[in-house]
Regions:
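Glycine-centered flexibility motif
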Residues: 1, 119, 156-158
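Hydrophobic secretory-pathway targeting helix
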Residues: 1-7, 161-162
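Extracytoplasmic/periplasmic regions of membrane proteins
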Residues: 5-141
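Juxtamembrane interface at the cytosolic side of transmembrane helices
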Residues: 142-191
Length: 191
């Protein structure tokens, strides 16, 4: 665990969506850990990207039956995400909606830091207009510097406990030699 987190104490997960449509990071992923999440989105064709965060009910309502790829699972320590596709409808112009609490735009890529203060929330990734996205890479990163030290402390504690257990087992093996009364020490050693 210490090696996986590294001194930065961060866990990073990535997926590339090949399906056209928006990408949704629901509350059970976005708000899974009580530390801010850093979201980076890169679009292969260099087109416009919009990241937007809204209360989950509002985000679900605006996406309705649109084509959406939803992050459905996070795999640690593999660092991957699963996507589940749903809907077939066209996307509304999400940029004009007044439901978004946080937004970030970019050409080819965009980044957003999502705090956990207003959970449950949903993150939506789109082109910013009605154009469907495809070949988009989403990277989610949670970072907490304390995680590294907590993992290091647990690893050290585990090593100390293992050393004590090994020592106890070794001493128990040596002291279980039967001592026969009346035999000299040298005979016991040969027997």
């Amino acid at each position: 665990m210490v090696v996986m987190l590294g001194p930065s104490g961060s866990a990073q997960f990535t997926v590339t969506s090949k399906a056209p449509g928006a990408i949704e990071v629901p509350a059970d992923v976005l708000n899974a850990v009580d530390v801010p999440m850093h979201v980076t989105v890169t679009r292969d064709d260099g087109g416009a990207v919009l990241l937007a965060v809204a209360p989950s009910a509002d985000a679900r309502a605006i996406l309705a039956t649109s084509a959406v790829s939803t992050v459905s699972a996070v795999h640690y320590p593999a660092g991957s995400l699963d996507l589940r596709s749903s809907g077939t409808g066209a996307l509304p112009d999400l940029a004009r909606a007044d439901i978004w609490r946080l937004t970030a735009r970019g050409a080819g890529s965009a980044e957003l830091l999502v705090d956990q203060g207003r959970a449950p929330e949903t993150l939506v990734v789109t082109s910013g207009d009605a154009t469907a996205l495809k070949d988009v890479t989403v990277t989610l990163t949670w970072a907490d510097h304390a995680w590294f030290f907590e993992a290091l402390a647990m690893g050290t504690l585990g090593a100390v406990l293992a050393a004590f257990a090994f020592t106890d087992l070794w001493q128990g093996r040596v002291s279980n030699d039967p001592v026969v009364a009346g035999q000299p020490q040298s005979r016991r050693a040969r027997a």
